[in-house]
């Protein structure tokens, strides 16, 4: 997400706390927040796919749900 969009989210947030938002501004804020959350979730999921959990003995103890998610992503890429 661009810096301009993040700045606009913050600007709208400040307006909402001080003078309130018009209906158009509220709709813009909601759309920008949804875009931000979508980008955040995607980035977080991509980061999780790089994680491997090991115990003290070096055994892979990555949760099965994460392994399955990694496998599904790999299938979509190939």
Curated annotation (Swiss-Prot):
Q: Main site of residence?
A: cytoplasm
Q: Which UniProt keywords apply?
A: Cytoplasm
Keyword set includes NAD: no
Q: Where are the transmembrane segments?
A: none
Note the coiled coil stretches, chain numbering. none
Which family would the database say this protein is a member of?
Answer: Belongs to the UPF0291 family.
Q: Name the PANTHER family for this protein.
A: UPF0291 PROTEIN BC_1827, UPF0291 PROTEIN CBO2609/CLC_2481
**Name the record gives this protein:** UPF0291 protein ABC2165
